[in-house]
UniProtKB/Swiss-Prot annotation:
Name of the protein described by the UniProt record: Proteasome subunit alpha type-7-1
Keywords, in A-Z order: Cytoplasm, Nucleus, Phosphoprotein, Proteasome
Self-association state and partner proteins as the record states: The 26S proteasome consists of a 20S proteasome core and two 19S regulatory subunits. The 20S proteasome core is composed of 28 subunits that are arranged in four stacked rings, resulting in a barrel-shaped structure. The two end rings are each formed by seven alpha subunits, and the two central rings are each formed by seven beta subunits. The catalytic chamber with the active sites is on the inside of the barrel. Interacts with PI31; this interaction is reduced by PI31 ADP-ribosylation.
Gene3D superfamilies in the record: Glutamine Phosphoribosylpyrophosphate, subunit 1, domain 1
Modified residues (Phosphoserine): S177
Compartmental location: Cytoplasm; Nucleus
Organism listed in the record: Drosophila melanogaster
GO cellular component, one term: proteasome core complex
Length: 249
């Protein structure tokens, strides 16, 4: 039955679904996990990178990209689709800065990306973007924001969220572990993001990519050694938690 309605993006199935959009969401669910945490004075984005083939040149295919000096984006899904979206968003940020003489707000650029995605769900001869985006950064007033957009064109703001493979598991982890006091500083926000990735990372700490954005400062990508230090702290805390549980029993 579904094959009658999934050949065109503009045709609804009898039960009210746009099957091509749902297929795009499935492409996101098969993508590498991406997480975002909004702290009191920073925004942290983290992704799990795919392992590089043995004979492949280890060129960096970053899943965390700058859209403007104050806006950073991570994504899950089809990398080629993300490349097009990133280029469009970067041009829009530059155009806005030239025309209005002010940088874009986080909601403005998120809405632009969401509207572009939505257009591709109503146009013949096109297909939806197979990516979900986590967009973080700071507005001119210094307030931090973290948004997520879906292939359907909807977007929401979050304190912490995840997308991609095992996103549901990570969201449940955030719901249990996110505390305002825990992310009051950069250290706590980074630790929470890395711990969330470790919950689902198939290759452990080896292929994690973490970026920190602070207001008025350039984006900072964490070195592998720094991530390893955080992992050691997290493992030590887990051991202490297990020890406390054993003592209670």
């Amino acid at each position: 039955m579904s094959s009658r309605y999934d050949r065109a993006v503009t045709i609804f199935s009898p039960d009210g679904h746009l099957l091509q959009v749902e297929y795009a969401q499935e492409a996101v669910r098969k993508g590498s996990t991406a997480v975002g945490v909004r702290g009191a004075n920073c925004v942290v984005l983290g992704v799990e990178k795919k392992s590089v083939a043995q004979l492949q040149e280890d060129r960096k295919v970053r899943k965390i990209c700058m859209l403007d000096n104050h806006v950073v984006m991570a994504f899950a899904g089809l990398t080629a689709d993300a490349r097009i979206m990133i280029n469009r968003a970067q041009v829009e940020c530059q155009s806005h800065r030239l025309n209005v003489e002010d940088p874009v707000t986080l909601e403005y650029i998120t809405r632009f990306i969401a509207q572009l995605k939505q257009k591709y769900t109503q146009s013949n001869g096109r297909r939806p973007f197979g990516i979900s985006c986590l967009i973080g950064g700071f507005d001119a007033d210094g307030s931090a924001h973290l948004f997520q957009t879906e292939p359907s064109g909807i977007f929401y703001e979050y304190k912490a969220n995840a997308t991609g493979r095992s996103a549901k598991v990570v969201r449940e982890f955030f719901e249990k572990s996110y505390r305002e006091e825990e992310v009051a500083n950069e250290h706590g926000a980074v630790k929470l993001a890395i711990r969330a990735l470790l919950e689902v990372a198939q290759s452990g700490q080896n292929n994690l990519e973490v970026a920190i954005m602070e207001n008025g400062k350039p984006l900072k990508m964490l070195d592998t050694d720094v991530i390893t230090d955080y992992v050691k702290i997290i493992e030590k805390e887990k051991e202490e938690e297990l020890e406390k549980k054993k003592q209670k029993k």
